[in-house]
Amino acid sequence: MYVVLEGVDGVGKSTQVGLLKDRFKNALFTKEPGGTKMGESLRHIALNENISELARAFLFLSDRAEHTESVIKPALKEKRLIISDRSLISGMAYSEFSSLELNLLATQSVLPAKIILLVIDKEGLKQRLSLKSLDKIENQGTEKLLTIQQKLKTHAHALQEKFGCEVLELDAQKSVGDLHRQIAAFIECVV
């Protein structure tokens, strides 16, 4: 089963992934972008080079295609639990050029069975961002991240409606333990 954790920077995805690693020891944990050796190179270029937004979108789509082919599909064939920090949902939300059609091509229509979406309000996001050193995306401000969050929600629910992906939307400001229990129960519902 393919499960993805989604949410804007600062909502606690990495914390939850760490807890899930302790709970689901036999699961394959991966990430997008950069879940393969080639993906790390593409991610580095996309985030650090002065390139057009369109070129950046295609680098991320290339990463997604390689990740699907070399990581996701083999693990699904082995019937493994796959837990990914981000997915095509982030790809569509963060890019102005990344459409569902292009992402379905890149993923060969391999979609997550379950989507966990961590959401946060403006004040909570401001507080979380004030506690960390900010990257290029986080430096664009809370309004930009809240716009991306709305796109994440829209894309996740569109995948639910069109393809039957299950979506669990959680308030990221709940306690780490409460969130972990809800996420683990959602995953275990089928495992």
From Swiss-Prot:
HAMAP family in UniProt: Thymidylate_kinase
PROSITE patterns referenced in this protein's UniProt entry, alphabetically: THYMIDYLATE_KINASE
**GO CC terms for this protein?**
cytosol
Q: What does this protein do?
A: Phosphorylation of dTMP to form dTDP in both de novo and salvage pathways of dTTP synthesis.
For binding ATP, which residues are annotated in this chain's numbering? 7-14
A single Gene Ontology MF term assigned here is: ATP binding
Query: Record's InterPro entries?
Result: P-loop_NTPase, Thymidylate_kin-like_dom, Thymidylate_kin_CS, Thymidylate_kinase
Kindly indicate whether the keyword Isomerase belongs to this entry: no
> Which Pfam family is an annotated match for this chain, by its short name?
Thymidylate_kin
| Catalysed reaction, written as an equation | dTMP + ATP = dTDP + ADP
Q: What is this protein called?
A: Thymidylate kinase
From the UniProt record, report the name of the gene that encodes this protein: tmk
Report if keyword Nucleotide-binding is assigned. Answer: yes
The catalytic activity of this protein is classed by the Enzyme Commission as: 2.7.4.9
Similarity-based family: Belongs to the thymidylate kinase family.
The alphabetical list of record keywords is: ATP-binding, Kinase, Nucleotide biosynthesis, Nucleotide-binding, Transferase
Q: Which CDD domains match?
A: TMPK (cd01672)
What is one process in the GO biological process aspect for this record?
A: dUDP biosynthetic process
- Organism of origin is Helicobacter pylori (strain HPAG1)
